[in-house]
Amino acid sequence: MSFYKKVTRGLATPLQGSINLFSGSPNVSGDEGTDADNENPEHRTTYHSLSGRVNHDDDDEDVAKLEDIVGFFTGLLNTTTVCAGLGSLNNLKKHYLDEFIKKSALNPLRPQNYGPETSSKLNNNSIEELLNNGDTSLEKVRKMSLYDFDEHTSDSEEEDSADKEEESIAENLKPGKSGKARNHPRDSRTTATLITTQITRTKTATTATPTPTPTSSVDTDVTDVTEPIGKVTTKIPEEQLQGLNPLQKSVVKNLDPHHVREGVLIKVKNSETPLKNDRQELLEKIQLRLKIADKLQRVFDLSDEDTFCGNYSAWLIKDVLLQGHVYLTKDALLYFAFLPKRFSLENSSEVLDEDNSSSIVYSGNLGLKSAKYGEVVLNTVLQHRYWAVLRAETLSIYSSSTNLYFPVLVIDIKKCLYTEIIDKEKLNREAISPVNRGTYSPNGGLSGTATPRASTLENTASELNSMLSGDSYSPTEDNVETTASTVWFKLVTKKKTYKFSCDSSFSARQWCNNITKLIFQHNNANSNGEVLIKIPISKIAEYNKRALFSEEEEEDRTLDVTMNDIPLNVTIKYLGDNDNERKRDKLKRKYKGEEPTIEEVHFLFPKSGVEFFETFDKLVNPVVSDNDNQSSKSSITSTNFSEKAISTLSKSPNHLVQTVLDFNKPVDDDISAFKKFGTTITSPTRIFKATITSPEMTSIDETSLRDSFDSDRLHLPRDMSERALKNLEVSFVTSLKKLEDASKRYEKPHMEHSQTNLASILSDPSEVKKESKTAISKSIKALYSVGTHWSATPNHYFELGKYYVNKVQDRDSSQRNFQSHFSTNSKLLASYYGHLLRTVPVYGKIYVSETDVCFRSLLPGVSTKMVLPMTDIEEVRASRGSRLTYHGLRLIVRGSEELDLEFGSSKSRDDFQKVVLSVLERLHSKEGFRPEPYQWGSNFEVELYKTRMEYSDSENREIQQYDNSIDIKFAEKKIEMARVRMFEDRLMAASGLDVPIILEDSPFFKTELRPSTSYNITLLTIGSRGDVQPYIALGKGLVKEGHNVTIATHAEFGDWIKTFGLGFKEIAGDPAELMSFMVTHNSMSVGFLKNAQQKFRSWISKLLTTSWEACQGSDILIESPSAMSGIHIAEALGIPYFRAFTMPWTRTRAYPHAFFVPEQKKGGSYNYLTHVLFENIFWKGISGQVNKWRVEELDLPKTNLYRLQQTRVPFLYNVSPAILPPSVDFPDWIKVTGYWFLDEGSGDYKPPEELVQFMKKASRDKKKIVYIGFGSIVVKDAKSLTKAVVSAVRRADVRCILNKGWSDRLDNKDKNEIEIELPPEIYNSGTIPHDWLFPRIDAAVHHGGSGTTGATMRAGIPTIIKPFFGDQFFYATRIEDLGAGIALKKLTAKTLGDALVKATHDLKIIDKAKRVSQQIKHEHGVLSAIESIYSELEYSRNLILIKDIHNQNYKRHHPVPSGVQTPAYDTDSDDYDDDEDDDESDKDDEEEEEENSYDGYDGNGVNNSPSQNSSN
């Protein structure tokens, strides 16, 4: 502990009484007061989650204890720390402290004359002499161990840090002295490390002249300080260093690439393969470091005589926050970062036969003010919805999620400059979601222990005020974005600006962040995906450091300045070498005598920032001139340095840094006065601000930078602190990689720094010249040359015969044009002219590349484009043309209808076919391709028999498993990206900055973002076994993520759920009774509503109560909307809420509601109406009971359909996008994840021997095997159904595996017996795992449940569906529309028999089922659902906060009179339903929604809603 800390710490208690008297406050006992303060929870960093868990505890001493004492020390130290323990004393405060010590008897104990030649140790003799004089104050000092007399200087981190702090304070008047070695006392320069002001080469007149330091001593100092504090340096034998140059020796000695330190958010995960300290391990380390030294020298052009000083983890702050490393050498500062593969360019020639989703960075719905009419795209006034797909190099806009071959618009990311949200004021009004569940619970209680209704409105308001960054207004619903209005963002390219709309600011930020990351990668990295910066020490003009945390919570801080825990921002300005600058501009600057370009970079050091800055300061300061300001500055600008700066960074708007600069600018009084009138006044600087129209971006104004950073702390829109970071509940988990992996990465060839600029980014002069032509001239030329092109010969761009284009210039021009038209890096092979047959034939140019077949219209006003991946082409065959002189060709596309092309000559058609087939042959050369039986045509039966005989022995049979390792890898990568998005959302809420984050793909360690605490997740559902099974699969996936999962459902499934290691809680209801009722009423009708109200009223009341009890202690709630209670429970607990279901439940024009499926399609308006109608009918039936339950048990006000905002709740559809493609009118928070399969037969399952023999005999008899089972359906006449099934099987001459579950429920008489005797063609198997059975059979007949439908489609077998109720009708229609099965409206022996024959022999149905199966096998629904939960978590939390604000305001203006008992309500009466009153205000509510207001509350929290007043 430092001298000054011990002085103030020791004197606090004895002087407290006098200090209190001095300040006029009553005297309190020192010891008791101190202990009381320490035990006060408000003064500790310990906080609790909603479930009562302790996340962090701080047992360290409170180094800021003096701040609790008022009076003298309060005035003395009122601004001692600038940001929660990150600053240091300024000159004035140190002066006061020095004067106080001089006047006291402590002055002789103060360390004197710190310097290179003197020791910092106290003289024990002098202390004993003072004690002998009887000085009681010194005796007190001795007792409290003011100074450790027996301590010795060592390399330990604590002692070294304490010494540094002592000497920094004691030597505040000697800023220029240079320190010696690490084991000796160091001085601290006032301009850099002491008071953290700007350090420039321009020394002020008041700064003391530094002591001249010999050049030889600089090297000694550098060598001594290179070993970072706390690092364990490997001792390298001298024989291993022989023959190495100085740079290599210093790298081997000082580089520790695997060194990682824990911090506030950084957690180090123990490596599974720890490093061994044997000789072999040592040799591997040396070899790795030599490889690193070789690469550093080659890439950064380092000298052999340079000296490596140390490496540090640092984040580059530009348009993104990029994780990387800073390497310090004697002559330069180096920054190096490996971009992740997701954001790095891949070799386009490497074509992978895998799902296209692997190359997708992000996808979703976007609004665009343009419409497609036929083949023409026109700008419109109205907004139209499109499906957008963001890939590594393109943003493609499609008319729907199923039509991905014909983009409406393709934007090349390489030509984009930046993207940003247009209405930024809307972001400032956005609600701040409470991340820390214990500290910022909306209701102030612990959801895990009790109903959180204890807090008052004042407490909630104070919490929300603290989260709203000190805004003067109170948090009401007018201040909070309800996400109802559209949010627009713009994408600025070199030639045009595009504007897109999103449904919420969360979605808009996600689009902007993902696009910004891609733009950063394309413009700021070399072709190897590496970001490089080299700043020569001799060219550094200015540097400074600033702390990141606020000083509001200094008393709660646990960070130790001496332990290098301080997150620091370091800004460096240097003289740049712009290689991209034109020679003409350079000459102009030279003749005008202008100064060189000043570049600047910003780094964030989460750890070891102080250590880095001290080392960096020692490297820079010796080269500072001793002359005055002007001479020093001129000498810098006029000197020609031999060292050259290197950077892959390009100029950009740098919105992230500019936002911080703008916020740190001093606010004038006039501007403050304007701000009081509101936020609609436009700033004059914004009016006259120049628009950026070229990649030559203007750099950040230097004067504004200097004015902004006069303080030693970086001010953010919302002050950050250590506690705020911990409240994010996210950690950067770092795990070390193997040495072998790092060595392999460094063995790969790397480009030199002169090759860092990508050739694909540079524009071609000829291309620019061509683009200057007007659209009219292009159209005239296109029409004029149609005849010539129609009869033109093919063009080949590879050496393959007579059509080869010989001129290099023509080949290069065609290649550039092709890449420009389709925004691809693929290599062009051939081009042709022809027609694409759409609604009408479209004339254009056809391209064949290594990866795609492309088409571009050449007709004026027609913008048709086609990009068809080669991997989707299954067959190319000639066909007849539509006219006599035309020559047709047909492309058979996987999973889609056929595409027809027409050519003007047979030679063009034949050459196209030949080239495409050659590409397909090369593409599939490594595959062991064997046609499926359905692909053999007339030989189908023979091939089917051969296949069955190969796999007839089920004990030895191994079903060919699809290798999904690549798909799982990409799905896990998407989960990692979703965690990053969750952290970005939380960081935005905490700091007010939208910070895109890129994690480095380091060869030394892996970093991933993970929640720092395990969430208690409750899955609430009702229904049959098929309704519960998907939730078990999801629960298993969430448990692997580290969370605690509980399924709340009927008692019947409790034991089954527990076998999977999941928690279980019981809710009311009998699934058998419910299904019996649903089968009786297979559609929505008046009788259904009447009978449901009479039969299930008491059950609904019990369901609501038991559901509320089962969800206690939850942190996240995921519910099937059929359970009815989840949205209200989440509102009461203040926790994020998701819905998950298997059937369409969201308003859309694409699909009707599952309960209103028409016999024939009736269009989008009817589909949308069915959803609105069902929502109102469903709510009308349960609203009375629900509102009574809300008031009496949940302590929530009544609600209505509008206030529930069900359409804004995040929704997860556990259905494959192949079966339920996401509609373009789905909001951003609606996700179609894929099926949640629970593979019960993939483990040690052993089928019954009778079943195995039955299947063997069917194969020998060459009979098809079908499965018939209707799950847990309850029917009236089970015997008649069984007879019809038996007759149909005999009629179709197939073998049947029967699961006769329809007679095993409720009908106790027939439960254990068979109604009729089954023939030998039928085997009654009972329940068999679908994932084991379905791949071994030919067709399946079932009821159309979502799970069973998914299992049959994944197996790729034709499906016959006989629906009974609910979503079964919807899936029967969908399967029939896809052509993969048959829907039975009526089940008889004849209809079922005919369907069995068609399903087992129709090759079109068989083929379509196989194609759907191939798509589903690429999906991983559980992983996609986890990704969606992470990505939408903060959006969901925000919705709950909005509702909580409404509820608190409602209670404030509608208090319950004291002493008045709540009246009892009759449960059989509907008088409690306030829908009639609420419906009267729905029109007003909708108008308020348009104005981005919510539920009738004005800005002052006053209720103006007529529905609220009338209902009470």
Curated annotation (Swiss-Prot):
The keyword Membrane applies. Residues 190-222 have a biased composition (Low complexity). One of its GO terms (cellular component) is cytoplasm. Its main location: cytoplasm. Residues 22-50, 150-222, 1450-1512 are annotated as: Disordered. Its EC number is 2.4.1.-, 2.4.1.173. Residues 1501-1512 have a biased composition (Polar residues). This is Sterol 3-beta-glucosyltransferase. It comes from Candida albicans (strain SC5314 / ATCC MYA-2876) (Yeast).
